[in-house]
């Protein structure tokens, strides 16, 4: 099932018991965060606050608060089915010629999907039903959440920032938080390596001193939103990828103030520009690490137009110590990463980003080990293959007899198969998340790899331990007589 807009997805969630409407007045200042956080930790539904205090616009929260809802947004019922998305991405990143007639036939569905990629331009889009310009532009009329007591100001969190570099044929979609600065001003917090920041840097180089057009879409259809946080191949636009997942082309329209294309079904569109000479101090804000981050200067986004649907819905979230919504997205997208990594490294059995590791700061990988030093090769590959993992500080590699998603197994492997000096890889001066205050320098720190695999000849001179395993015949016999032993429940072993 595919969803052309956010509202059809809301209806689907509500029909399936995955969305709760809240009519009681709730304040976007702190109260919504507390409610959303409690509900998310209880694995509860998405929330639609129908009467935000001092605002008339409903607020949608916790939309992707469980891996199941992320899967539902992509037309799947089970998060494990998201591996199909990963298979598609792996194919798009590195397509292979058919190995024969049967293989060619099996690839036809992927090629047919690829034909649905280009976005479709529409007229009279829903996102431009109401147009506000000049003095009508007032961002304070939006029910923007003020998430934590130490936050400096309300924060736009789920906006799709749309940019285009002067040397690129496609637009970039990225999600960057934006601090409310005034009635028509937001601070665009994008890190220097992100797509939007790179586009802006190219523009400044080619057109020094000129204003850079930017558009932010709020409340787009769920597939387009998720396309912006998925490892889409660099040569493909997020709109094209969203169409690929949806099975039909993404509908877009031209912005009113520039040539950028925006998702036509969006609830709210903010149009404007960034003056290369206008910067402002951003933060502090509570972040996905569970701490308040440092302040720093970022470009100011001046909003010249606000367009929206009639009776728009404001889509919002909060970030904090895991679990939060980004962590739940990470759990779901974990399944997307597995086939992509396996395509490059077939020896990988499974890959896990534990949500308590702030979505990406720690990874555990199980492999079918084939030679001495194999674990270290996989570590280096994971750090370098996808830019999503350039900030991963810790990688643990285990054998295929260890469940990399079970900490009991992983800790056992670390403590029994590792020598701290021999099996630890340390790399200095690598890119680190700017928000990671534990690094000695902002944006630059170290990485640690833990080889918790069984050691082969060449890696050790000692006789290696053999795991204890019960005789299968004995296990089978005990299973057959268990009820006669008078012990209440048979432990699962």
Swiss-Prot record:
Taxonomy of the source species: Bacteria, Pseudomonadati, Pseudomonadota, Gammaproteobacteria, Alteromonadales
Pathway: Cofactor biosynthesis; ubiquinone biosynthesis
Protein name, per record: 3-octaprenyl-4-hydroxybenzoate carboxy-lyase
Function as written in the Swiss-Prot or TrEMBL entry: Catalyzes the decarboxylation of 3-octaprenyl-4-hydroxy benzoate to 2-octaprenylphenol, an intermediate step in ubiquinone biosynthesis.
Catalytic site positions: 287
UniProt: prenylated FMN binding residues: 175-177, 189-191, 194-195
GO molecular function per UniProt: 3-octaprenyl-4-hydroxybenzoate carboxy-lyase activity; metal ion binding
Gene Ontology process terms (BP): ubiquinone biosynthetic process
